[in-house]
Curated annotation (Swiss-Prot):
TFIIF is a general transcription initiation factor that binds to RNA polymerase II and helps to recruit it to the initiation complex in collaboration with TFIIB. It promotes transcription elongation. The modification N-acetylalanine is found at A2. GO terms for molecular function: DNA binding; phosphatase activator activity; promoter-specific chromatin binding; protein domain specific binding; protein phosphatase binding; RNA binding; RNA polymerase II general transcription initiation factor activity; RNA polymerase II general transcription initiation factor binding. CDD domains: TFIIFa (cd00240). Zn(2+) binds at E503, H512, E517. Heterodimer of an alpha and a beta subunit. Interacts with GTF2F2, CTDP1, TAF6/TAFII80 and URI1. Interacts with GTF2B (via C-terminus and preferentially via acetylated form); this interaction prevents binding of GTF2B to GTF2F2. The modification N6-acetyllysine is found at K407. GO terms for biological process: negative regulation of protein binding; positive regulation of transcription by RNA polymerase II; positive regulation of transcription elongation by RNA polymerase II; response to virus; transcription by RNA polymerase II; transcription elongation by RNA polymerase II; transcription initiation at RNA polymerase II promoter. It comes from Homo sapiens. Belongs to the TFIIF alpha subunit family. This is General transcription factor IIF subunit 1.
Length: 517
């Protein structure tokens, strides 16, 4: 080489020989510097191919002849591949990775993966210096990157799945605890809402424990609930006189609602109470045995009203006119009796002022004329009636009293009457009275004017389909369809549910009723 400058004087020349025909193939083994590979410590090394992927490239072995063989299967398979452009990759052992073991089983393991495309655009050579100082250059055939293998035991698929589930549990522990806190907060809020609902007005339609109590929200249901507890006490106590009833009106209590109601509102309840007490066939012999002694003594209010109603019904129109004339012109004896009865009523008012008007039955009787108050045992309704009673008031309540009397007679003789006569008596008073509260007795249907009837069969059918709340049942029996008021529908449903005794379940903090088929 020619000297180009003072720096070129130290240049040395080397001879590089490249062999034309080489039987050996040279490959490069590349290790990462972080692995800290030290060849000086290698006492033993073993290098072998990893042929575990051979099964992937193997084709299914099918018999060419005999059972299970197909005619020209290989030719047809090749034609199919050419049609769809499928190119099969052959299994080439030289392309498989290397496995390097250093210093036996206890040593390290490396896996060398072939680096593709290294020799496509570049050429790598390995230079070896010969004894004469010249270099021999051998071309690099392949390049392998070696990475160390993990020494610890790897997990199987099942073990890995178990570990993954455990990992999810650990990671989700915080979220689970957070959900619990939120649930506790929701429960506290629900309890507060329940307390608030309990403090609300009783205007909501709800049916509580059917076995113990039927506490309905409407005023009519409250009145019917009070009737059951108050009527037995009313039997023992004498009714109050007219003066006591006037004072009660002045008090302005809740009972004023009953004063403003129409005629016949409590007719159904009166009949139920009276029929329950007198229609049982077992009590009839006892009452017959005691009848001679009781008839001689003073009669009670109910018996007097029954006898007076019977006498009124049996009288022809002419006798009614005569009775009215006699009322207008009172005799001196009647005046004397009237004074005695007023004194008795004042004394009874003072003695029984604490327990006045405890029954819905006597509330309903407030509309009746005062001639049916306390009477002597031998006197009739005509002799003890007060002359000052207006005739319009007696005419307005006559239909209600007649209906009550007929139903009382029906309850007393229910075991003796035939079915046809009983049916006639049932339908008669209802046509006379203006309104009547529907009470479902032993039968399954209730009389109503609408298309849909609130019957026990209908309620059973709804409850056997799916659990329902009382609100859902009230939606099924709407007032437009049944022809009943909301209070009447609530009463009928309450009695039907009490009779069916369905199962109760709490779903979303709401009481649901259901029946099994």
């Amino acid at each position: 080489m020619a000297a180009l400058g003072p720096s070129s004087q130290n240049v040395t020349e080397y001879v590089v020989r490249v062999p034309k025909n080489t039987t050996k193939k040279y490959n490069i083994m590349a290790f990462n510097a972080a692995d800290k590979v030290n060849f000086a410590t290698w006492n033993q090394a073993r290098l072998e191919r990893d042929l575990s992927n051979k099964k992937i490239y193997q084709e299914e072995e099918m018999p060419e002849s005999g059972a299970g063989s197909e005619f020209n299967r290989k030719l047809r398979e090749e034609a199919r591949r050419k049609k769809y452009g499928i190119v099969l990759k052959e299994f080439r052992p030289e392309d498989q990775p290397w496995l390097l073991r250093v210093n036996g089983k206890s040593g390290r393991k490396f896996k060398g993966i072939k680096k593709g495309g290294v020799t496509e655009n570049t050429s790598y050579y390995i230079f070896t210096q010969c004894p004469d100082g010249a270099f021999e250059a051998f071309p690099v055939h392949n390049w392998y990157n070696f990475t160390p293998l993990a020494r610890h035991r790897t997990l199987t698929a099942e073990e890995a799945e178990e570990e993954w589930e455990r990992r999810n549990k650990v990671l989700n522990h915080f979220s689970i605890m957070q959900q619990r806190r939120l649930k506790d907060q929701d429960q506290d809020e629900d309890e507060e809402e329940k307390e608030k609902r309990g403090r609300r007005k009783a205007s909501e339609l709800r049916i509580h424990d059917l076995e113990d109590d039927l506490e309905m929200s409407s005023d009519a249901s409250d009145a019917s609930g009070e009737e059951g507890g108050r009527v037995p006490k009313a039997k023992k106590k004498a009714p109050l006189a007219k003066g006591g009833r006037k004072k009660k009106k002045k008090k302005g209590s809740d009972d004023e609602a009953f004063e403003d109601s129409d005629d016949g509102d409590f007719e159904g309840q009166e009949v139920d109470y009276m029929s329950d007490g007198s229609s049982s066939s077992q009590e009839e012999p006892e009452s017959k045995a005691k009848a001679p002694q009781q008839e001689e003594g003073p009669k009670g209010v109910d018996e007097q009203s029954d006898s007076s109603e019977e006498s009124e019904e049996e009288k022809p129109p002419e006798e009614d006119k005569e009775e009215e004339e006699e009322k207008k012109a009172p005799t001196p004896q009647e005046k004397k009796r009237r004074k005695d009865s007023s004194e008795e009523s004042d004394s009874s008012e003072e003695s029984d002022i604490d327990s006045e008007a405890s029954s819905a039955l006597f509330m309903a009787k407030k509309k009746t004329p005062p001639k049916r108050e306390r009477k002597p045992s031998g006197g009739s309704s005509r002799g003890n009636s007060r002359p000052g009673t207006p005739s319009a008031e007696g005419g307005s309540t006559s239909s209600t009293l007649r209906a009550a009397a007929s139903k009382l007679e029906q309850g007393k003789r229910v075991s003796e009457m035939p079915a046809a006569k009983r049916l006639r008596l049932d339908t008669g008073p209802q046509s006379l009275s203006g309104k009547s509260t529907p009470q479902p007795p032993s039968g399954k249907t209730t009389p109503n004017s609408g298309d849909v009837q609130v019957t026990e069969d209908a309620v059973r059918r709804y409850l056997t389909r799916k659990p329902m709340t009382t609100k859902d049942l009230l939606k099924k029996f709407q007032t437009k369809k049944t022809g009943l008021s909301s209070e009447q529908t609530v009463n009928v449903l309450a009695q039907i549910l009490k009779r069916l005794n369905p199962e109760r379940k709490m779903i979303n903090d709401k009481m649901h009723f259901s029946l099994k088929e």
